[in-house]
């Protein structure tokens, strides 16, 4: 039997699993800024064993024949600070090329089990080489080799060809204790101008708080669902 997509729905409400908090998202929760609350929600998602609680959908702008088109994919947030969220990738990938042309993006964290999501939007800039190097050294060796082997987002003839590229890179760095950072690889920092916290509620009357960030100044307003 085919799935009835129109009938699929979840009745939000009550205390989110593992949160131990009132479900009613309150402006007071943002007294310390947007970053502590986002960090807290990621930690709560971790506590209830959500897979990759730091995953976020990154949306960029692809300019095709002079026309802007949306593009999105899931990446992992690898850094969180009052300045913004950090992620790493191949600078020559589709998203890297798009960010070079239009250095602005949106990122959305979604935790359905908790009935929560957070949406950030703002300009994007590359992280420093020093910051990239620190994170690179924390990556598993297999991931480092993969970053050298893959020309991300470009066509390849077969899986076998990709495996051969990995074998060549593995041989190249055999005996090398610290694999260097590829010149085409590094981090990005998304500096949010807006951060929206969303909490599901019964009857689809969800809680939405929008944080606007302008330098040291922050304002919070409640949005209708």
Curated annotation (Swiss-Prot):
Catalyzes the oxidation of either pyridoxine 5'-phosphate (PNP) or pyridoxamine 5'-phosphate (PMP) into pyridoxal 5'-phosphate (PLP). It is an enzyme of class 1 (oxidoreductase). Homodimer. The keyword Oxidoreductase applies. InterPro entries: Pyridox_Oxase (IPR000659), Pyridox_Oxase_CS (IPR019740), Pyridox_Oxase_N (IPR011576), Pyridoxamine_oxidase_dimer_C (IPR019576), Split_barrel_FMN-bd (IPR012349). It catalyses: pyridoxamine 5'-phosphate + O2 + H2O = pyridoxal 5'-phosphate + H2O2 + NH4(+); pyridoxine 5'-phosphate + O2 = pyridoxal 5'-phosphate + H2O2. Substrate binds at residues 9-12, 78, 135, 139, 143, 204-206. HAMAP family: PdxH (MF_01629). Its EC number is 1.4.3.5. The keyword Flavoprotein applies. Binds 1 FMN per subunit. This is Pyridoxine/pyridoxamine 5'-phosphate oxidase. Pathway: Cofactor metabolism; pyridoxal 5'-phosphate salvage; pyridoxal 5'-phosphate from pyridoxamine 5'-phosphate: step 1/1; Cofactor metabolism; pyridoxal 5'-phosphate salvage; pyridoxal 5'-phosphate from pyridoxine 5'-phosphate: step 1/1. GO terms for molecular function: FMN binding; pyridoxamine phosphate oxidase activity. FMN binds at residues 73-78, 88-89, 95, 117, 152-153, 198, 208. Coiled coil: none annotated. Its cofactor is FMN. Keywords: Flavoprotein, FMN, Oxidoreductase, Pyridoxine biosynthesis.
């Amino acid at each position: 039997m085919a799935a009835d997509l129109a009938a699929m729905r979840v009745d939000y409400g009550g205390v989110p699993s593992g949160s131990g908090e009132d479900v009613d998202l309150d402006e007071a929760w943002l007294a310390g800024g947007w970053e502590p609350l986002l960090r807290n929600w990621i930690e709560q998602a971790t506590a209830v064993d959500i897979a990759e609680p730091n995953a976020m959908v990154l949306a960029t702008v692809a300019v095709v024949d002079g026309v802007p088109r949306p593009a999105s994919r899931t990446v992992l947030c690898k850094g969180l600070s009052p300045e913004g969220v950090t992620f790493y990738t191949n600078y020559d990938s589709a998203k890297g090329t798009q960010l070079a042309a239009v250095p602005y993006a949106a990122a959305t964290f979604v935790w359905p089990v908790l009935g929560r999501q957070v949406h950030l939007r703002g300009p994007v800039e590359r992280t420093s080489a020093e910051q990239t190097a620190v994170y690179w050294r924390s990556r598993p060796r297999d991931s480092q080799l993969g970053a050298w082997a893959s020309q991300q987002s470009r066509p390849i003839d077969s899986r076998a060809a990709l495996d051969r590229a990995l074998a060549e890179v593995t041989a190249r760095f055999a005996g090398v204790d610290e694999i260097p950072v590829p010149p085409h690889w590094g981090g990005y920092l998304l500096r949010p101008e807006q951060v929206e916290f969303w909490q599901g509620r019964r009857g689809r009357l969800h809680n939405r708080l929008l944080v606007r960030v302008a330098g040291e100044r922050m304002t919070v307003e409640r949005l209708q669902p």
